[in-house]
Amino acid sequence: MRRIVCPPVLFLSASLLTGCDFSGIFASIQSEVPLKIPSIRGVVTGLVKCNNKLYACAGQLWEKDASKSEGKWTAVNFLPGKKITSIVSKGACVYACVSGEGVYTYTSNGAGRTGGTTTPSTVLGKTNGAIRIGGSDNPFLQMPCELSSGSSGGGGGGSGSSSDGGIKNGSDENVLGSGTGYVVTTKAVYTKSNSSGTSCTYTKDGTFTATTSPILGCTSDGKGCFYVLDGTDVHCRTVQASGGGNGAHCAVASGSATSCKVAHTVTNPLCIAHVKNGQTEFLLIGGSQGYKEIKLETGSGSGTGCLKAENVRGPEQWGEDSVTPKDRVSQYEGTIGRFAISDIYTVESTSGAGGTNGGTNKPDVYVVVGDSQDGYTGLWRFDAQKKEWNRE
């Protein structure tokens, strides 16, 4: 059995990266938007914003000034010789996991300054043997399989105490995401079952059933709704943060079951992300060839959070409010639309970065691309100011 815990010092979840073989030819688009030489090569498995800098991990830690629309990523002199597999941020700190070893801390000096501080240089307490970290507001730490039938695996590489709370789950079950009162894994949705004390105790939610197995991803709108991705559908749910026992019920005020899930129509779906693009909110579903979007119903009515089939849109249906506007669809189709997108990240714009729409900021969107020839594998960004996709 694995144990997934949430000790007070940490904050977690994770995105699963799927390796796929894909090919494409970019020559036809080079004349329209010259492609940059990538400053990060390889598979990016995490991206966070910390102290007005961006940090990515692709085996090692990379950083970039988030306040500038241009600029290259530079490698951070942090944990040389070790392979960082996942990261989260909190305040001015980046927490980096070396799978099977534990979690280390890197303190960012902030935008306009180079370097940082490794604090401490040893594995953080209660993280020995950690496999993965992830998430934001209520992240989780995933620990390895138990070493014996008598150990809980909580917070100590198989030798911790069950008083840490968390989830006891199978060795083939991985955390995909978490938020206030819930955790989503590849097999189930778990909801908080104990509203007292500081421990994080969760139980499998019997009110939620995925259409297909395994569950592939989850994302949150930051306002109480979270969305679960499986092979055919996206499910909209909400949960009481205090763990009132109602489970992850339908997030739509009307309670209509047909409003709580929709077929995403994405071939070989791999990831899901929530994007607030100006005044419009979307779910982006990455798959084996680019992504599709689901426009969310927003407002104060009974349809808030509602998922509708008519709002599932491919490139031919994108509008000016889309992440990739309709007049940039050809550039999308000539670049990332040809390849697998295995992860999607959004970064709120700061001074000098991002675009605007009537005074409302639009975020930059980063995607992880997979190419069978490896020539275009890596991190790409939609620059909301320039309105174009390009390599990072």
Curated annotation (Swiss-Prot):
GO CC annotation: plasma membrane
Membrane topology of this protein: Lipid-anchor
Residue segments, region Disordered: 148-173
Localization per record: Cell membrane
UniProt xrefs under PROSITE patterns: PROKAR_LIPOPROTEIN
Residues with lipid group (N-palmitoyl cysteine): C20
Annotated TM spans: none
Lipid-substituted positions (S-diacylglycerol cysteine): C20
Biased composition (Gly residues): 151-160
First and last residue of the signal peptide: 1-19
Keywords: Cell membrane, Lipoprotein, Membrane, Palmitate, Signal
Family recorded in the similarity comment: Belongs to the TP013X lipoprotein family.
Protein name, as recorded: Uncharacterized lipoprotein TP_0462/TP_0463
Annotated source species: Treponema pallidum (strain Nichols)
